Structures are given as structure tokens and as C-alpha cells.
Amino acid sequence: MLWTDCLTRLRQELSDNVFAMWIRPLVAEETTDSLRLYAPNPYWTRYIQEHHLELISILVEQLSEGRIRQVEILVDSRPGAILSPAEQPATTTAALSSTPVVPQRVKKEVVEPAATQSNKILNSKKRLLNPLFTFSLFVEGRSNQMAAETCRKVLTQLGASQHNPLFLYGPTGLGKTHLMQAVGNALLQAKPNARVMYMTAESFVQDFVSSLQKGKVEEFKKNCRSLDLLLVDDIHLLAGKEASLVEFFYTFNALLDESKQIILTSDRYPKELTELDPRLVSRFSWGLSVGVEPPDIETRIEILLKKAENSGVDLPRNCALFIAQQVVANVRELEGALNKVVAIARFKGSQIDLDVVRESLKDVLAIRARTISVENIQRVVSEYFRIPLKELIGPKRTRIYARPRQLAMGLARELTGDSFPEIGMAFGGRDHSTVMHACEKVQSLKQEDPIFNEDYKNLLRLLQS
């Protein structure tokens, strides 16, 4: 069934929480040339329309081989339709017991995929760009600002040698895929006929092996080497795939020879990819390599507020602050925490407040209470820099103690829910302004001093492991 196939693809494209909460409950009805989706209520319908209908429409057109080019989203007002508690009006029972009604259409519920959407797929189901991965929906902060600015610059100088290839590296879940696909989406917006291909390293291997088995290697080469923009995620996963590495090496060279833009992502800096062919690693460094780091607390707050706004959720700032203080690893975990808070609030039929947030994140809070505290941070920092704990906490202001102390204060603010005065008390009774200054100093030194930044990242990994 078409909708079943579409659900399989949507499960791959969306997070587990979003898929389970918003997509799975939809009821589908297929006609000769259209697909109707029924949602439980107007709020649900509006959310799907604003956030997922374009993606669904692209997939439906693709999976039906062009037969279905119209997708409708309808409010299912039939008796027995389920409403989420938070959205259920007081008159629901009376309304449903009245005369039978037909599904009510909401405004602008029909999406007609543009003919140019075929460029996003580029003859393969794996070439789909996520329409939500745009620059306007990307939240910038100190940790990712350079990467975002570089990606925008690439658009104005596509294929220029100084940033070709563009290599984005950093831990998983920080927005590297969002940024690289934002370049693809922006290019297609400006030039609908541009040839853009997005793929993971794993899908490159699968497609290449499939082309060998089917005797279509030349077609595979032509598709990959006639692009304007090639986007490859998790390039480090090519390790050990010798035949695929050789093919990618020649594809890479062919595109660069034609000044076609390549953007790659990895969890490590190019020179750390020792398991890949040294010739390929060397070429990764020909252009520009930009790191993406875990977001600081201010950026985490803005990410939460923007995600909530885009989902039509009222998230008070104090609740966003609380979530940001507890979830520090990456953006995906932030989104998962927010989804859980929203789900609990809807289930209870209540507004989001600190009580709901604490209940939703009780497992996270329990884990953090056992693992990360100011005292634990002080111990790890003193051991890392090999200085006595009493000197880290004490009054001495010499550089050998002051820098680690500032770093420990910054990490305490970043990783715990403690206030500035509480952190100050833990560091020998210092006042809140001293802690604030230390946190500001940490943020500036991370940008200015590579050694300090490396120490910060090492300590963050130690504390989160």
C-alpha cells in the first residue's frame, strides 16, 4: 500500500518521537490521483501542514511514480475520532453526537509538488533533501556560527577552491546534516534546475554495490559525476569499503576538476581519519574544514524556543532554561526532551510549566544527580590539570590556578542546574559576579585560544562519559 511505503520512508527521515507522536496516528485514504490524510483535530492538521506535508507530498509523488501529485490534509470530525487531551474542547461530546459530518478542510491544505522537486530526488529515493533543513530554521550560536557563515558563503562562491571541499566535523547530533542540506535547499530555491545529490556514506556504498550487481556502473558514475553539488554525510563510514573508496576517490576528483562543490561531514577532523586512504584524506584538507561543537546554554535555550515556536507550542522561557541546563550533549537530545515535555503536557491536558518539565525529565534529572555535580566537576578539573583541589577552590589568583578555576566555573554553569551564587559558594564563597565573569571569559577563550578550547572539549567529554 502506498501509505505503508510512505510511512517506512518517513520513519527514516524523522525522529522516532515525531514519527510516533504526529505521523503514525494519521489515517490515509487513497483515490485515483490523490491521497487524503485525516488528523484528529485542527491543531494536528495545522502542524502537519506546516511541518511535514511538503515532505509527505514529495515522497508520495516519488513512491507512486508520479501518479499521485496531490496530498490533502483533513480534520477527521467523524464520531469516534480521537482528540489529544490538550486540544479537546469542552463541547466535543455534544458536537460528535450531532448529525454526521464530513471531514472539514483547512485552508491551504493541498500541496502541489513543483516539477523541480524531481531535482531533489535525482533519480533515487535516497536523494531527498529534508525541506525543514533551511538556514532560517537553523539556530546559530558560538558553537556553530563559523560553520553556518561558511555554508552561506559557499552558496555565493559555489566550487571556489578555498572552500572546496567544505568539511564539517564534530560529534553527532549537532546540526551538521542540517547545515549541509540547507546549502542544497537554498541552491535549489535559487536555481531549480541545479543538480544536487545528498547521500550518506553508507548509501553511496549500497548504490555502488547495487550498480555493480546490475551492470549499471557507468550510469552510477554519470549520476555522481554530473552534479553541481554533492553532499555526503558521515564520510568516515567509508572505512574498510575498499572498492567504494576507490570509486569515491575518482568521483571526488572528477567533481573538483570541474569546480563542482562538495560538502562532507564526519565525526572527526580530516587528519584523524587514519582508517581512510591517505590520498583521500589529503584531498579533504584541500578546501576548508570547520568544526561544530556542542551548543552553549544560551544557544540551547534558543533552539528549544524556536523548535517550540515552529511546532505551535507555548514554551515559557524559564522552562526552556531548565531543559537546557539538564540536556547538554546535542541538539537531538534537546529535541527529544522537548517532545517528551510536550507529550506529557498534552496527556495531562495542561500548560507547560516547571512542574510538567520536572515530571517529564525525571529520569534525566536522576541520572544527572548521580553523575554531574559542582564537586564532581572540581575533582575532574583538578585531576586534569594536576593541581591540588584546595588550590582550585582557594583564593590564589596566579594563572596556573585561575584559568582552570574559570573553566571549572564555566563547566559548572553549563552542566548543572546551579545558579551563579550557588556555584560561587562552592568555589570558596565567591560572589555571583565573579562566576558570571568566569563564564563570559570561558566563552571568549574558547574562540580565541585553541589550547583552551581543546581542554574545554576534553573535560566536557570526560564529564559526560
From Swiss-Prot:
Record region (Domain IV, binds dsDNA) = 346-465
Renumbered residue ranges of the record's region Domain I, interacts with DnaA modulators: 1-80
| Sequence positions that bind ATP | 173, 175-177
Origin: domain of life: Bacteria
Segment Domain II: which positions? Answer: 80-127
Write down the SUPFAM superfamilies for this protein, in alphabetical order.
P-loop containing nucleoside triphosphate hydrolases, TrpR-like
Any single GO molecular-function term of the entry would be:
ATP hydrolysis activity
Under Pfam families, the record lists: Bac_DnaA, Bac_DnaA_C, DnaA_N
Q: Which GO terms describe its biological process?
A: DNA replication initiation; regulation of DNA replication
For this UniProt record, the keywords arranged alphabetically read as follows: ATP-binding, Cytoplasm, DNA replication, DNA-binding, Lipid-binding, Nucleotide-binding
Q: Where in the cell is it found?
A: Cytoplasm
GO cellular component term of the entry, any: plasma membrane
Region of interest: Domain III, AAA+ region: 128-345
Coiled-coil-forming residues are none
Q: What is its main location?
A: cytoplasm
State the family it belongs to.
Answer: Belongs to the DnaA family.
What is the stated purpose of this protein?
Plays an essential role in the initiation and regulation of chromosomal replication. ATP-DnaA binds to the origin of replication (oriC) to initiate formation of the DNA replication initiation complex once per cell cycle. Binds the DnaA box (a 9 base pair repeat at the origin) and separates the double-stranded (ds)DNA. Forms a right-handed helical filament on oriC DNA; dsDNA binds to the exterior of the filament while single-stranded (ss)DNA is stabiized in the filament's interior.
The entry's free-text remark on domains says: Domain I is involved in oligomerization and binding regulators, domain II is flexibile and of varying length in different bacteria, domain III forms the AAA+ region, while domain IV binds dsDNA.
What does the subunit section of this Swiss-Prot or TrEMBL entry state? Answer: Oligomerizes as a right-handed, spiral filament on DNA at oriC.
Q: What is this protein called?
A: Chromosomal replication initiator protein DnaA
Whichever gene encodes this chain, its name is dnaA
